[in-house]
Amino acid sequence: MKKVFMLVVAGLCVIATLAALKGEDEGMGFNEVSALDYCDAQVRRTLVSLADSAGGMDYTMMPRNILKDESQWNLRKTTRDEWCSGFWPGVLWYDYEYTGDESIRQEAERFTESLKYLSQSPIYDHDLGFLIMTSFGNAYRLTGKEEYKQVILSAADSLATLFRPNVGTLLSWPRNIEMFGGHNTIMDNMINLEMLYWAAKHGGNPYLADMATTHAEKTMKWHFRDDFSSYHVAVYDTLTGEFLRGVTHQGYADNSLWARGQAWAIYGYTMVYRETRDSRFLDFAQKVTDVYLERLPDDYVPYWDFDDPSIPDAPKDASAACVVASALLELQSYLPSDVARKYRSAAIKMLTSLSSEKYACGESKPAFLMHSVGHKPAGSEIDASIIYADYYFIEALIRLKNLL
């Protein structure tokens, strides 16, 4: 009965916040507070749905996706090869940051704690940065607890073992060296450099920051075409470090522009500039942003790959829009007012579309957003609600709220 009551309350909150957002869409202007209220209501719906009949919860099971024709989260066990496990704790930490609700903080702590063992396990791949910084990174940022700091430092040391000095980048997928025919570095890996920079600033080996910068430099040199669009995967000779080729894994083709890959580039180089204050990275962040913005459809939410020949019938990828919106709200803070205004306006247009009835789940699902694409070539998570879309959506809203 209690679970049913909580679902009813959460549902009423969703209705109220969606009504507010709809009014804003019709002329009142985007309001990040209404969007955050909506996220909070959806978080509470998810928490209710995760509880068993006795009110208990398995904190090792994380929301991953809600497929197109489904209405509830599919859960995944927290394991070292489940790269999305940190995003749900991260969503809870951002919701706690917004609401100040101690019950949300307690749930965030419990889900975060279930990931601790990953910092002490043999490294699986580059995704350890996603797993730890979204969960423990936000936990430490909001609480300052020493135990969280130690987990991040340990994980950073583990991630650093993937760095290959002869190549100059981290090896993204050790298990796929043979498949790609060499040392593989994927664009997603740019996000994981943040953990190396963080550790270097918080008592870890200063060389971790040098390692991250070297990776960013090598990626900047070889991972992009002349127009600053990115390959998904850069393949290097394992022995000599020579760049061999750029290919795709999750995009449409080797020479196409996979939307989320470019989103990782925008977010990653913005972060690298924050950590280094090296103007080369600020300039490059703008270049990779501009090629993305120039190719967006009218609603500012990209198709999953900008070069899919089935456009406009190709699926959209809301997750890419969320990553970019969050990145742009940081990037604009480093730029002169005229350029900053351009990027800030683009981010708000993205968030406005994402908050509309076209993309927001509303009462139909407890996720924030619909219409993301995970891995289309593999037929996986196409036109789905995906947890990392929700993570970067709420992060972008928090950044906008703190900006205004």
Predicted region positions:
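Glycan-recognition and catalytic cores of secretory/periplasmic carbohydrate-active enzymes
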Residues: 22-404
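Bacterial Sec-dependent N-terminal signal peptides
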Residues: 1-27
